[in-house]
């Protein structure tokens, strides 16, 4: 479909149910219909490290996946208000993962992601930073990652989740069904 200029967007029921505002704003952004929002330029923002609770509150309101466990949380502040958050998790040997980035969807934040990432690199001097992007929302050729100098390492196959079909519907990651964490009864019969 890409050759015809068509992009399909898959939205899960629980995303729309729990994050309707974020989903609708993402669609507007993809369609280029965000131009009537106030613009905030990175040069007018200060970068401040924040605690996990503050990052969690912001990401719950502005990121479709909410908060992800992080070691470092940076925020972009404009006129005393947090307008963007970028979080990182550390691994061994100065390797890091960029776990979340979100800006306040009430604004068009120009260059803020790049400024947050540059600040992180200057403060923490990582040897390597990796990140994962949901292909449903991130174009593979022109996106925040490529603008910040990331290179595409690979594309993972689609994964699965379990669905608890109560109302409201809930998708549950397969990680929650490992035998180590489930109460499993094992029966044996010996003759």
Residue ranges and their predicted role:
Residues 29, 56, 83-84, 188-190:
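Short amphipathic alpha-helical surface micro-motifs
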Residues 172-179:
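Short, amphipathic alpha-helical interaction segments positioned at domain boundaries
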